[in-house]
């Protein structure tokens, strides 16, 4: 398979609203999986907490981490608002996610980070 970048990524909804639960949790999970698949990004582990998302992913070298995250957060915002139009009123200006994200490359710590998700 060649070189891939394994990253631990954390990002949150705007205003850290505790929105990721129930029907929204399943829908947001489907959207994020679909968008990762479209870009050839493999999800090793993922955890949807009420106010943020953790993902352990392999990103192909043709994608930069920042361009992938821009795509993931931007496109998923549009898809979330299409599926759940009522959320537009809480978030305004079509941005579901807050600015920025946390990322750390995994390297030799992959097993320890995977254990965190379990």
Name every feature range the model reports, one short phrase each.
Residues 1-118:
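Basic nucleic-acid-binding interfaces
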């Amino acid at each position: 398979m060649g070189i891939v970048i394994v990253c631990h990524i954390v990002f949150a909804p705007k205003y850290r609203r505790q929105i990721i639960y129930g029907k929204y949790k399943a829908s947001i999970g489907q959207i994020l999986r679909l968008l990762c698949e479209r870009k050839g990004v493999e999800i090793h582990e993922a955890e949807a907490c009420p106010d943020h998302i953790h993902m352990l992913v392999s990103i192909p070298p043709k994608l930069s981490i920042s361009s992938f995250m821009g795509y993931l957060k931007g496109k998923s915002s549009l898809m979330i608002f299409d599926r759940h139009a009522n959320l537009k009123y809480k978030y305004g200006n079509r941005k579901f996610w807050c600015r920025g994200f946390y990322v750390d490359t995994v390297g030799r710590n992959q097993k320890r980070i995977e254990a965190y998700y379990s």
